[in-house]
Structure formats: C-alpha cells, structure tokens
C-alpha cells in the first residue's frame, strides 16, 4: 500500500513539474532578429561641372517634409539635413553664394536677407513608403499550446508615394517665380521586405525554438537612399545657372516694387 501511495505521489509531482515547464515555455516570446545590413547614406554628387561664379546670393529655406509613420525620426532628420546640404552644393556648383535660412517659412526672412538675396529656394512635400497591396501578404499566428509560433508576418514589396515640390521665389516680395514637382510614385523603386512582429498571444511550445527575421528597416533605408538620389538628380537638372538667370528680369521688377 505504501509503495502504491509513493508511486502516486511521484506521478503527481511529475505531472505538476511537467505542467509548470509547459506554462513557463508557453509564456516565453519568440526572438525577432532585426537586420542592419543597409546604411542610410543619402549620397549624391552633382553631375554638372562647376560654372563661373556670379556675384549673386540665393536664400535656401530649410526643407519642410512630412513622412510616413514607418520612417524613423532619425532618418527623417538626416534626409532633411542632407537635402539642404546637397541643394546648397548644387547651387554653389552653379556659381551662387548660398545663405542657409534656419526656417521653412519665407516670412522669416530678415530685411537684410530679402534685400541681398537674388532668389530664394523653398522645398516641401511628403515622403511615403508603403507596402504594395498587390504584392504584399500578411500571415497571423494562430493561438495554440504547441505549434503556435507567436509571430505575425508581413511580406511583400515596399514602394514610394508622395511628392517633392521645389519653389523659386523672389525674396523681397515673397512671390513665386516658378516651381516644379516630383511625383515619388513614378519612381521605379521596389524594395522586398519581411516585417515580423509578436502576436497578441505568447505562442506555443514551438515558439521557444523559433527565431523571426525582420528586414523592413533595411528596406526603408534602401528605398530612402534611392529616393534621395532621384530627387537630387532632378533638382540638379533644374537649378542650373542658365535657368536661374532667366528669372532675372521678373525678380528685379518685383524687388524694385517693394523697395519703392
């Protein structure tokens, strides 16, 4: 009888131990490995050769861009700063002295800046990166004690949307002399991605042996690098000395009216 009771007691403890191990394992979240193989370089070298310097100054306003939620704040800031830096280089390459204005609003020009600036360049727009609905699938993990991975996955292709608008102004009057807009959805940029997130449930036993991969951040950086290069190439084509000097008559008239 004692042996029988001892066996039952051992079996009960073993059962409790097994249940505890199961509960512990089920409560563990699967590990997600986020790749970091792409650098946000935002490189561009002006294509045209340097031209003869002019005794004219161009005011360069800080870019006013909005971004989709999946673009990190640090990427937003770097994109904005690099845009201003490269446009400044493009204008200098075309023979102009550039005055960088720490504002996106033309109303913040000082009187001295309005007076000495031949032209002003303003930039605004929206930079959106979104999954292509036709080529993106989502797979959610089903709850379960054993075979649930506890990972939700979205796999597909990231594409750009939005626009960048560049406006050329006469600083004293604030009047627009010209503008051009780039439609980002027309760019041939397609970045494959796999985004993995933890499910609303913790997953089953198999989740402790599963490692998820998330390369969506690398896809975003790669897309931003390509968007940046395309934008700069177009700006480089438009902001030539020949084009900018064609506004001289209108700019002089507008500035003269305000000075009277």
Curated annotation (Swiss-Prot):
<protein>
    <recommendedName>
        <fullName>Neuraminyllactose-binding hemagglutinin</fullName>
    </recommendedName>
</protein>
<dbReference type="InterPro" id="IPR038531">
    <property type="entry name" value="NeuraminylLac-bd_hemagglutn_sf"/>
</dbReference>
<dbReference type="Pfam" id="PF05211">
    <property type="entry name" value="NLBH"/>
</dbReference>
<feature type="lipid moiety-binding region" description="S-diacylglycerol cysteine">
    <location>
        <position position="28"/>
    </location>
</feature>
<keyword id="KW-0998">Cell outer membrane</keyword>
<keyword id="KW-0472">Membrane</keyword>
<feature type="region of interest" description="N-acetyl-neuraminyl-alpha(2,3)-lactose binding motif">
    <location>
        <begin position="134"/>
        <end position="139"/>
    </location>
</feature>
<feature type="signal peptide">
    <location>
        <begin position="1"/>
        <end position="27"/>
    </location>
</feature>
<keyword id="KW-0564">Palmitate</keyword>
<dbReference type="InterPro" id="IPR007876">
    <property type="entry name" value="NeuraminylLac-bd_hemagglutn"/>
</dbReference>
<dbReference type="GO" id="GO:0009279">
    <property type="term" value="C:cell outer membrane"/>
</dbReference>
<keyword id="KW-0449">Lipoprotein</keyword>
<feature type="lipid moiety-binding region" description="N-palmitoyl cysteine">
    <location>
        <position position="28"/>
    </location>
</feature>
<keyword id="KW-0732">Signal</keyword>
């Amino acid at each position: 009888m004692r042996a029988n009771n001892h066996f039952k007691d051992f079996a009960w403890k073993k059962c409790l131990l097994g249940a505890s191990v199961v509960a512990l394992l089920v409560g563990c979240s699967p590990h997600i490995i986020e790749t970091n193989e792409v650098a946000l370089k935002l490189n561009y070298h002006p294509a045209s050769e340097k031209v003869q310097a002019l005794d004219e100054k161009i005011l360069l306003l800080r870019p006013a861009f909005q971004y989709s939620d999946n673009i990190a704040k640090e990427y937003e800031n770097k994109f904005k700063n690099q845009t201003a830096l490269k446009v400044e280089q493009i204008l200098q390459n075309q023979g102009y002295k550039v005055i960088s204005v720490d504002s996106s609003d033309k109303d913040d020009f000082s009187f001295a800046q309005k007076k000495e600036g031949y032209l002003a360049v303003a930039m605004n727009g929206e930079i959106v990166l979104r999954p292509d609905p036709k080529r993106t699938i989502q797979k959610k993990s089903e709850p379960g004690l054993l075979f649930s991975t506890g990972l939700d996955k979205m796999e597909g292709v990231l594409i750009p949307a939005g626009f960048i608008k560049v406006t050329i102004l006469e600083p004293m009057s604030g009047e627009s002399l010209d503008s051009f807009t780039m439609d980002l959805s027309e760019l041939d940029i397609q970045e494959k991605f796999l985004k993995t997130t933890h499910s609303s449930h913790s997953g089953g036993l198999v989740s402790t042996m599963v490692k998820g991969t998330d390369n969506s951040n690398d896809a975003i950086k790669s897309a931003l690098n390509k968007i940046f290069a395309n934008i700069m190439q177009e700006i480089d084509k438009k902001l030539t000395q020949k084009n900018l000097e064609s506004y001289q008559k209108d700019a002089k008239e507008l500035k003269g009216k305000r000075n009277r």
